[in-house]
A protein has these predicted regions:
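Beta-rich carbohydrate-recognition and catalytic domains
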Residues: 39-224, 236-283, 298, 306-351
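Aromatic, loop-rich ligand-recognition surfaces of beta-strand-rich domains
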Residues: 387-453, 463-510, 518-519, 529, ...
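Short beta-strand segments within Ig-like beta-sandwich modules, predominantly Fibronectin type-III
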Residues: 456-459, 551-557
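Conserved aromatic anchor
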Residues: 522-534
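Beta-strand-rich modules
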Residues: 562-583
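Extracellular fibronectin type III
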Residues: 579-593
Length: 593
């Protein structure tokens, strides 16, 4: 979690002010006694798919400008259910299936301190957040109740971005750090007290000269500034310790996670061959940094990540969940290909990303739009341009404002994602009346309309509402009519329609050419022929022909510069082509030394 840009000499003063501010903000929060949020869900119980960003009740921040945030997630499974802790959420989230989420409120935890860490040990959950020593460690055996007790009242380490790791032998370790100067650290803790034992070690620091993903900027284009290295997380797999970290900064589309590997929990750590492991620089919602890796009830690995909007404020962020794998050689990778399209939530052990694919394609990209009204700086086309950082806004938030998309072909519609944006909002924190009400309809002729989803009586906060249709419909037009917004205008960062259009998938793309920059080998330039009928392209690349784990989506264009390579690594590239009917995989793989 990137707090601010401070030289080392001001760190102590910063931490003191950070804590004072946290205490002040806590006094502003008026939450009920530690109970589930009493909002009635209207989500269909038959839902089996999801789409990023996760459709959580993201809390409005307590200071201006009015905006929502959640970041620095920590997910764990406790007694077969999921608990998700994230910065500035006014509580923590609970789910039985990773599809439907409830908010648990509590007065017992320091919810205004950034980057919460939570771990299960001996039948209890332990919690701590960033801050200045002495810090408190909290414990509960009943997280659903929201009741926590202080377990350790004087944890002695001042730090940001804590991470607890319990080894298979029961020993407890602590990783931390968030700096554009200092390294990440690790130390062993006494599992009976959570106090440090042994000697602190430095585990890694930036080498942005040769690791392009550590360079700042949306496209890793800024070399001169040191990155923020932060967000430690450790996973043990087949006897190896995978130390994950994030950089170069939470506000960038390039925000990602990379990994070092060791034979012991305190290292020494060596950079893994495949990096970054979690990377999503393009698409509707981007970045996949400051994450944690966990296993679901079936043994599948997942990576829950911070994703950027960062328009009203640098810390305007959302969360995404991505499937994660370890291959036969122990190489770890997070699958972010089509990472904001719908995917299946498994109910069994899986072995590849292909098992989660729905086959539903994006039908709404850059399609003709009609609206009831629009603001000059937020025109209607921004509802379908696949960019969460821009938005269409009606002139008001009144009942009856509407938007309609012409898909241009009568297509099979399987799902719709409604991504609201908080335009002209004044809301702060949590409170009554924070929910959306709407009517979603479809038509084949723009005259006769039928209901897709009726949420005119909804009282659930659904800022990124995802509607999976139990029975697909044939539609050419999709219309969304506003009945209520919490505050401000009726505004959408994206009205996204998924399914399949008639026709065939595009042909393979030809003449992929790749040129590596020998003066700065973290960079590579790609060009290819535009393919008729293609919506976009997916560049897959990696460290071997059978390890093309990276995914870079391109819409419309036929050229790309990637600046996130390891200067010392050989790479292999191919290109897939997609449209509203399907994906055509590239078969020619090009080696780049």
């Amino acid at each position: 979690m990137q707090i601010c840009f401070l030289p080392p000499t001001t760190y102590t003063n910063f931490m003191n002010q950070f804590l004072k501010g946290s205490i002040l903000l806590l006094t502003l929060i008026n939450v009920s006694n530690t109970v589930f949020s009493q909002t009635k869900t209207t989500t269909k119980a038959t839902q089996t798919t999801v789409a990023n960003p996760v459709n959580l009740s993201y809390r409005f921040m307590l200071d201006a400008p009015s905006r929502r945030e959640a970041a620095d997630p920590n997910m764990l499974v406790f007694k077969g259910e999921y608990y998700l802790f994230a910065s500035k959420s006014g509580g923590y989230f609970h789910s039985k299936d990773m599809i439907h989420w409830d908010l648990i409120k509590t007065n017992d935890l320091p919810l205004e301190d950034y980057a919460p860490a939570a771990v299960e040990l001996n039948g209890a959950i332990y919690f701590m957040a960033s801050g200045n020593a002495p810090l408190k460690v909290y414990r509960t055996t009943d997280p659903k109740s929201g009741k926590w007790e202080v377990f350790n009242s004087a944890f002695p380490i001042t730090m940001i971005d804590p991470d607890f790791f319990v080894d298979t032998d029961g020993r407890l370790y602590f990783y931390y750090g968030c700096s554009n100067v200092n390294p990440l650290y690790a130390i062993e803790l006494d599992p009976k007290t959570f106090n440090p034992i042994g000697t602190r070690v430095e585990v890694m620091n930036s080498k942005r000269e040769i690791y392009g993903w550590e360079r700042k900027g949306d496209y890793n284009e800024i070399m001169k500034d040191r990155p923020w290295i932060e967000g430690s997380w450790t996973t043990k797999h087949n006897g190896k310790y995978y130390l994950q970290y994030s950089g170069p900064g939470t506000e960038f589309k390039s925000y990602s996670d990379a990994v070092y590997v060791a034979d012991k929990p305190l290292g020494p750590f060596t950079l893994a061959r495949h990096n970054p492991i979690s990377y999503k620089p393009e698409g509707f919602v981007t970045s996949a940094g400051h994450s944690n890796t966990y296993q679901d009830k079936y043994g599948n690995y997942w990576h829950v990540s911070t994703m950027t909007i960062s328009q009203k404020h640098m810390f305007e962020r959302r969360l995404g969940i991505f499937p994660t794998f370890f291959d036969k050689d122990g190489d770890m990778y997070v699958y972010t290909g089509f990472g904001d399209f719908p995917y299946k939530m498994p109910t069994k052990k899986i072995s590849s990303p292909a098992e989660l694919a729905t086959g539903w394609m994006l039908l709404s990209y850059n399609k003709p739009v009609e609206v009831s009204s629009e603001q000059p700086n937020h025109p209607k086309n921004l509802a379908v341009n696949e960019d969460i950082r821009s938005f269409w806004s009606a002139k008001t938030g009144n009942k009856g404002e509407w938007i309609s998309i012409d898909l241009e072909k009568t297509s099979t519609v399987n799902a719709v994602q409604i991504n609201y944006y908080e335009n002209e909002s004044k809301t702060m924190g949590r409170g009554e009346g924070i929910y959306y009400q709407y009517l979603l309809e479809y038509s084949t002729d723009n005259k006769t309309w039928k209901t897709l989803e009726d949420k005119r009586n909804n009282t659930t906060d659904v800022p990124h509402d995802y509607i999976e249709l139990k029975t697909p419909v044939k539609a050419r037009y999709i219309r969304l009519t506003n009945y209520k917004v919490p505050d401000g205008t009726f505004a959408l960062a994206g009205l996204r329609v998924f399914g399949k259009a008639p026709g065939v998938a595009p042909a393979q793309t030809n003449n992929l050419t790749i040129k590596r920059n020998e003066a700065d080998r973290v960079m590579v330039d790609l060009t290819w022929d535009k393919q008729a009928g293609a919506t976009g392209y997916n560049i897959r690349y990696g460290i071997a022909k059978d390890k093309l784990y990276q995914n870079y989506q391109v819409l419309g264009n036929n050229a790309l510069t990637i600046r996130s390579l390891n200067a010392n690594q050989k790479y292999y590239f191919t290109i897939d082509t997609f449209n509203e009917t399907g994906v055509t995989k590239g078969t020619k793989i090009i080696e780049v030394n």
